[in-house]
Amino acid sequence: MDYQTIPSQGLSGEICVPGDKSISHRAVLLVAIAEGQTQVDGFLMGADNLAMVSALQQMGASIQVIEDENILVVEGVGMTGLQAPPEALDCGNSGTAIRLLSGLLAGQPFNTVLTGDSSLQRRPMKRIIDPLTLMGAKIDSTGNVPPLKIYGNPRLTGIHYQLPMASAQVKSCLLLAGLYARGKTCITEPAPSRDHTERLLKHFHYTLQKDKQSICVSGGGKLKANDISIPGDISSAAFFIVAATITPGSAIRLCRVGVNPTRLGVINLLKMMGADIEVTHYTEKNEEPTADITVRHARLKGIDIPPDQVLLTIDEFPVLLIAAAVAQGKTVLRDAAELRVKETDRIAAMVDGLQKLGIAAESLPDGVIIQGGTLEGGEVNSYDDHRIAMAFAVAGTLAKGPVRIRNCDNVKTSFPNFVELANEVGMNVKGVRGRGGF
């Protein structure tokens, strides 16, 4: 399926974006190995998260999926209750699922194969294979990419590990393995990454120690059931935040969005560029802060993106670069080489698409330089990347003509009702097949 857009006359209204993808992954995994029954409200029913649910079900977890209400009811099997799956576990397109499951499965008393789609089979896994091996895990792969064959070892040993680069997925993978290891596992990271795993461990009553740069867990503990309500995903909200910011006449409110400080880079950077964003009704529930976000149209200016904001914005850069494309002046992004090993090479994909829409964009080895200008209509390729597809749908709100975005089926991995919500607030996005459109 493709997307086709026509320019918007302005966004308005109030919407609630679906539940946070990162928290959904971690929550269902942890409650599956907890003791007792947990209800998970606001679970993201995207393909990536449902791949995690399926994998856990294949290992004996009892998970009732109430899809139309975004609810899971999970009867935990306890720390030692998982069973060997009958076949390889398919993680689909999800790098988070395969890395978290690798940590969980490294300490089980059975062997497992983890695989995924063609995109996932190009994603780098050496970053988890090396430290898990130090803990006593044995993992076979060809070229350090999936499929991964994990030979479970119930006698893992805790380690003190310095992450070479900050990564919430790697940190979480090792913490999960540490739950099954003898002794203490401590992870030190060079900069703060998203801390949903740590917050969830606390919510499910697992003892951990944390200081500014390190997090430690000791093996042998138990997770206890505890109902949880997942906030809206700020990575999904970002598409509407940028769309309202760049489209004249816009004013929208996004309800109950997760505003974890480790995820606020996109708001920080947009405010540096001159955006009119107001965060109100701040509350904290289930260890996670949430708030309403009101956004009004504003004129933006280009900036040099500070290095300390890169990790906090890593998933939102595709749509942030759309904001840069219409800002006055130049925007420079560096220290973001991680964007090249996402679902696609996001630096190359964004530069290619922006150039096709008339924007001067230059690729750097670790980033991009964008000279703000006027978005023209045209046709771009999403390269089967959900965030690229939605970013260019946002570009279509302000482009001078229709924008066609190729290969958008993958949006279902993270935001199944994107088109519905986009049109609800006035973005004019249509899913089309063949050569049809507006």
Curated annotation (Swiss-Prot):
Superkingdom of origin: Bacteria
UniProt xrefs under Gene3D superfamilies: Enolpyruvate transferase domain
Pfam families the UniProt entry points to: EPSP_synthase (PF00275)
SUPFAM superfamilies hit by this protein: EPT/RTPC-like
Keywords associated with the record: Amino-acid biosynthesis, Aromatic amino acid biosynthesis, Cytoplasm, Transferase
Pathway(s) annotated for this protein in UniProt: Metabolic intermediate biosynthesis; chorismate biosynthesis; chorismate from D-erythrose 4-phosphate and phosphoenolpyruvate: step 6/7
Root EC class: transferase
Primary location class: cytoplasm
GO molecular function, one term: 3-phosphoshikimate 1-carboxyvinyltransferase activity
Family: Belongs to the EPSP synthase family.
Matches recorded under HAMAP family: EPSP_synth
Entry-linked NCBIfam families: aroA
Function, in words: Catalyzes the transfer of the enolpyruvyl moiety of phosphoenolpyruvate (PEP) to the 5-hydroxyl of shikimate-3-phosphate (S3P) to produce enolpyruvyl shikimate-3-phosphate and inorganic phosphate.
Record-given protein name: 3-phosphoshikimate 1-carboxyvinyltransferase
Annotated source species: Coxiella burnetii (strain RSA 331 / Henzerling II)
Gene coding for it: aroA
